């Protein structure tokens, strides 16, 4: 049985703007009634980890979303269907990165998380693979089946198959979204660099287009016969927003982004706009600065809980039912994470995800 210490090492927001440091001794997070304490075995980096600086978090706040590990303590108010026990291997996103709960984050030796939004790992899955999948699963499910309101699901094929544009098809969320769409019976189109075409097709794209090409929008319109009505933008730059709008068919449709964007960029009233903040699936809302701030929403927690339950069942079907994004397992544990965050900021991480074993 694991002995749980009272303090731990963690990667935290540093005292200077934009800095990330390793704290040698901070208290463990409290375990709320519906939460579990997890001994972290692996973590993965996401672009959002580069943004959690003053204004979002305060100096000393723990960083990190994606993790995998082993349950070492369980709160008394777990939902009946979840029934997590000490010793269970789990993964997911922390419901941390929140100045209201400064000791909760993934980049620690022990983290706390609501049990209902954790996913039990199948026996065949490694901690490294599991750590790389949490944010991608929740972001893809949230965008495709909640925001875009696509028919079908991970376990049910839609009666009508739709073209769906994934802008950023070679990102970690993009490759997961491609797989979700194929399972739901849709026809995903990836936009990425030409060097990642094979990867996009391997993850489920029926076609791939190079965003460097001036003709890629027209090529998408030609392929879809001017009938594209769904777009998920995993990049969210001015050029990606405009490209997604222009690729939409004459009747318009729905556009969802991973980040906030300027809605005045889109002139077509027939295109319904949205963006998602995946952490709201944890039910706590957000105290990040505008436009991220929002009130707690129990309905989103219920939806996120159901997604975790469904994803857990799908992963239990066998190895490679849902494939993780290509990853690089890095040496150095927590001490190496600050340099990994710098690498993402400098644009050195493309087409793969950085994973650290602890």
From Swiss-Prot:
Disulfide pattern: none
EC number from the UniProt entry: 1.-.-.-
Keywords, in A-Z order: NADP, Nucleotide-binding, Oxidoreductase
Residues reported in the UniProt entry to bind NADP(+): 48-51, 170-173, 193-196, 211, 258-259, 349-350
Tree of life domain: Eukaryota
CDD domains hit by this protein: enoyl_reductase_like
GO terms for MF: nucleotide binding; oxidoreductase activity, acting on NAD(P)H
One Pfam match: ADH_N
Keyword DNA repair: no
Pathway(s) served: Secondary metabolite biosynthesis
EC class of the enzyme, as a word: oxidoreductase
Described function: Trans-enoyl reductase; part of the gene cluster that mediates the biosynthesis of cordypyrones A and B, 2 pyrones that show modest activities against pathogenic bacteria including methicillin-resistant Staphylococcus aureus (MRSA), Mycobacterium tuberculosis and Bacillus cereus. The HR-PKS milA catalyzes the formation of cordypyrones A via condensation of one acetate with 10 malonate units. Since milA lacks an enoyl reductase domain, the 2 beta-keto processing domains DH and KR of milA collaborate with the trans-enoyl reductase milB to catalyze the different levels of reduction.
Self-association state and partner proteins as the record states: Monomer.
Name of the protein in question: Trans-enoyl reductase milB
Native species: Cordyceps militaris (strain CM01)
